[in-house]
Structures are given as C-alpha cells and as structure tokens.
C-alpha cells in the first residue's frame, strides 16, 4: 500500500516543464473531446426519445407504429403541436386581484376560527366587512387599490393583554376605505 501512496503523492506534485505543459494540455483536450462529444450526443438522443414518448400520445399517434422516427420529425411534430395549442385567455388585472383577495379572506376566516383573539361577533363583523369591501370598491373604481395596510379598528373582547392591563374597546369602522389611485400596473399579492 505504501508504494501506491508514494506514487499518488508523486503524481500530485508532478509539474511538467513549461513547454511540455501546453503540449500535455493539448493532448488531454484531444483525448477528452471525443468523450465529451459522445456524452453530448447521448444527452440529445435521450431528450429526443423522451420528447417522442411525450408528444406521440398528445397528437393521437401510436408509439408502436412510430418507433423509428428521425430527430427532425420529432422536432417538427413538437413544433406543430405547440403551435396548435389554443392560447390561454389571460385574466385581467382586476380578476386576478379579486381572486387573490378572496383567497386571503378565506385564509383569514380559517385563522380567526381557530384563534381566540377576537370575539365571535367581532370576527364575524370583520369577515363581513372584508367580503363587502371589494364589491363596494369595484363600483367606485375600475382598478384594484394600491398595496397598503387597511386601517380597520375592531371591537375586541374585554380581555387582558400580555402585560396584564385590560384591552381598550374601540369603535369599529363600517365604511370601506375609498379606492386609491393606481400607481403602477403590477399586482400586489398578500402572500
């Protein structure tokens, strides 16, 4: 075992003469180039085979009848299939905003149901307010409000805070906030 360790150490410390270094590097590239090319071709062929197995069922062709296809045929079939896909109707900005808003309200209702931060009545009033807010806003303006934290003051049950002092009851707001002007076209998502 000792001779192998010595041989490994000597190979690790081996430094060819400056003229030989370039020659050895060139020879190494020449020997590695066919291996790299072989690997590259294997990757291309594997990807084309996967593409063929994916695309044939989608265009209604039988894999067994098309076992031998040229690479160009596979690529052409794929391009035709992708061109024939009908374009997806993009939701407009307001619909995406409303969808995100609804998801947020649903998540909040699940959290409020489990927590005991608000009384049942206050929790219900908050959820009713949040469910009404986008409808009231959509009648006033045609765009979603800019991102901001809502200023909703709710009546909290007379419990004590973490520090032992009673929590103060504050009147709740029944009007939705007016829709602010739209500053940019990006959509704010609460998550």
From Swiss-Prot:
Entry keyword annotation includes Ribosomal protein: no
Family matches, as CDD domains: bHLH-O_HES2
A Pfam family the protein falls into: HLH
Chief localization: nucleus
Location of the motif WRPW motif: 188-191
Keywords: Developmental protein, Differentiation, DNA-binding, Neurogenesis, Nucleus, Repressor, Transcription, Transcription regulation
Superkingdom, natural source: Eukaryota
Tissues expressing the protein: Expressed in the animal half of the early cleavage stage embryo. During neurulation and organogenesis, the otic vesicles and retina are the main sites of expression; expression in otic placodes begins as early as stage 13.5, persisting in the otic vesicles at stage 30 and beyond. Also transiently expressed in the olfactory placodes. In addition, weakly expressed in primary neurons. Expression in the retina begins at stage 21, and is seen throughout the neural retina by stage 30.
Spans traversing the lipid bilayer: none
Biological processes per GO annotation: cell differentiation; negative regulation of DNA-templated transcription; negative regulation of neurogenesis; negative regulation of transcription by RNA polymerase II; nervous system development; positive regulation of gliogenesis; regulation of neurogenesis; retina morphogenesis in camera-type eye
Domain bHLH, chain residue ranges per copy: 28-85
InterPro entries in the record: bHLH_dom, HES_HEY, HLH_DNA-bd_sf
Recorded GO MF terms: bHLH transcription factor binding; protein heterodimerization activity; protein homodimerization activity; RNA polymerase II cis-regulatory region sequence-specific DNA binding
Domain Orange: 97-130
Subcellular location: Nucleus
PROSITE patterns documented for this protein: BHLH (PS50888)
Record's note on what induces expression: Differentially regulated in the ectoderm and neuroectoderm by notch and neurog2/ngnr1.
Record comment regarding domains: Has a particular type of basic domain (presence of a helix-interrupting proline) that binds to the N-box (CACNAG), rather than the canonical E-box (CANNTG). The C-terminal WRPW motif is a transcriptional repression domain necessary for the interaction with Groucho/TLE family members, transcriptional corepressors recruited to specific target DNA by Hairy-related proteins.
Function: Transcriptional repressor. Essential in the retina to govern glial versus neuronal differentiation. Promotes gliogenesis through the inhibition of neuronal differentiation by at least two distinct mechanisms; represses proneural gene transcription, and also physically interacts with proneural proteins, including neurod1.
Subunit structure: Transcription repression requires formation of a complex with a corepressor protein of the Groucho/TLE family. Homodimer, and heterodimer with the other bHLH proteins neurod1, neurod4/ath3, hes1/hairy1 and hes6r. Weakly interacts with the bHLH protein hey1/hrt1.
UniProt-recorded name of the protein: Transcription factor HES-2
The species this protein was found in: Xenopus laevis (African clawed frog)
